[in-house]
Amino acid sequence: VKQKYRIHGDNIIECEVAIGIITDAIKFTTGSDYSVKLIESISVTPAYEVSFENGLEFILEFFPGHNRWNVSLPDFLTQLGSPLRESVDAFVTLLNEDTEVPLAAFEFCNALPAGNNAWQRAGRALSMTSANIPYFYFAEIGGQELDANREIKAPRFPNPIVPFSYLSMSSATPDKCTTIYMPSRSISKDTYEEFKDAFADNDYKNAISALFTGNEISEEFLKNSKIKSSQFVYDLAEKRKRSNTHSLETWQKLLNSAKLGKPLAGHLLSDNLKWTKKISIESNPSLPKLIALLKLLEVSAIGSVDMPFCVIDTSKKAKLAEELSKLYGETLSNEFVDWLKNSDKDLVVVFIAGFKPRGDDSRPDRGLVPLARMIFANDDVNVISVVYGPAKAITWSRLFEDPYMLSANNGLWEAIVNLSNAILVDSKTLPVGQRRDVLIKAQASKVEDTSLARFSNIPRFGEHDVDSVLHLIFSNSEDNGVFESLCNPPGGDWSGVSFLDSEGSTNRWTSLPRVTGIEGKRPDHIIQYFDTNRVVLSIESKDLLRNLEEGVGPRLDHYTKELLVNGMAQSKKLKDSLEWSQEINLEVLKQAVSEYDFLSAVAIMGNEAEARESLSKSQSNAAFAISFVEDGSTELIFISNHPKLREMIINFLNTQQNKLKLLNINLRSIN
């Protein structure tokens, strides 16, 4: 009986990336080639048989889209001791009769890891390692920032302290946090040369392979990844302005401590890098005074002078408590002041805007406190979170009534409450005279002897399933003259559009704009018909007809045409090559694109009547309506008002009958 595994992915693309990583790792360690074959399953949870020439065989089943199944993965992680209910891009389990056994978690970052987005994912690493699940973070380096004309401006990089945090975490949780840095597909030759010593080799593949071959994971497997991660941080630090960050000598001390799992607060406190954080949003008059107070105390910067956190030596906390009492008066509790005075630990202060002008959560900020905890994973420090953004008044009421209840229903507050020792509020929306501090009492970690129940194959149907059907049908179809240029299901990162030119080379446009003027709308899918009839088909997918935008079809056409015709491609891969370069023959590419018609389609969950209405409502050239039945079968309805496109798609779908049968998809085209 073949062993069965499941990949619970953020979407179907992440599931496919995970299966590629797993099979590549096993091939590397065994030297055995393999095949991956779609087997009889259903469209919402497609299954694949993986067969290696050495006799190893197993089945991998995809479960795309988190938090829509009969079992809650975040709740399970909480029971295992995770302070956060954060999911990852791909969570791999071993399927038993009634349960699933967690094996590994994969995170894929191929968007530009800079600015506040660089720490958005920090909570995921903390969530997995706290639950004792091996976590592998794959990050592409050297992605290009584009100017307003979509020409390459410069590569973007994170603050060195962000990748440093993963290195620190890897020492605090041996064998549980591994970072793999790889060159971006749009990396320049110069940038590649700068960072080539930091790019991963194949050692980490031994650790991934061991999860599926029954071997022990040796620390030796991951040792080199730690060395590479350290090199990447050092290379980043070397590129930064000297006045903005620590000296290279200090960075080397920090890296040595992180690799050995030793505390690092002492290095930061003795480095004398002054913290100079600036607040960019409208704030209370007291907030600049708080920042000025911290500067007078000569608190130490972490990573660079402008990061939103600093560290304070324990010897300065009594003075800090005294000055905070003067600044905030009776709105600061005696309990908070006494705690601050009497604690014998160094203090990390994290500044969190947390909220947009209208009071909605700012998603990237949920990673700030996890990032601080990861940096100091080998230190025993206290953390105060200063929340200064314009949260709604009801939020403050809930925070002071029951912070744990608030955290149970909100990811931002979950990170703040569960990973801070205290919270200080200095926001314009806090009622005058309201107490502004919360002390977080230590909660016993809920490490339970629990198992993950087997997931049902039938989810709460939605846009994920529409996107999965389109992707399963159109992907891997080059032999039939069809190329999937873009698939961006929910949770996707819009990392790029690919296009096959007349020479068979793949040209890629990255860092996609959300719109191209008021006339353009970024599609969810782009399909290239490159055979006799040359068409670029842009598709908008939605769950329901009512959520479909009026007149979106022409806007899809405009976006894709504007991008491919007038926008510069950033990278190119020759036919049958694995290497990407920036050497693009613009003349060949422009000529190839000019030969195509640009058409549009929409895809929704629905019946024949809704298919017809979606075609009219969207003003597009074709529509797909998809019905999901409780028994797992799928009905796919296709309609088009464009004779050429209708014939092309029907002919193509007829070549996919075997695939449709395996996925239990019933096709019906209507006039």
Q: Each predicted region: which residue ranges?
A:
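Phosphate/oxyanion-binding active-site loops and adjacent basic polyanion-contact surfaces
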Residues: E14-C15, G81-S87, P113-A118, I458-D467, ...
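Compact beta-rich and alpha/beta scaffold cores in large eukaryotic transport/transcription complexes
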Residues: G9-I13, I21-A47, F138-Q144, K196, ...
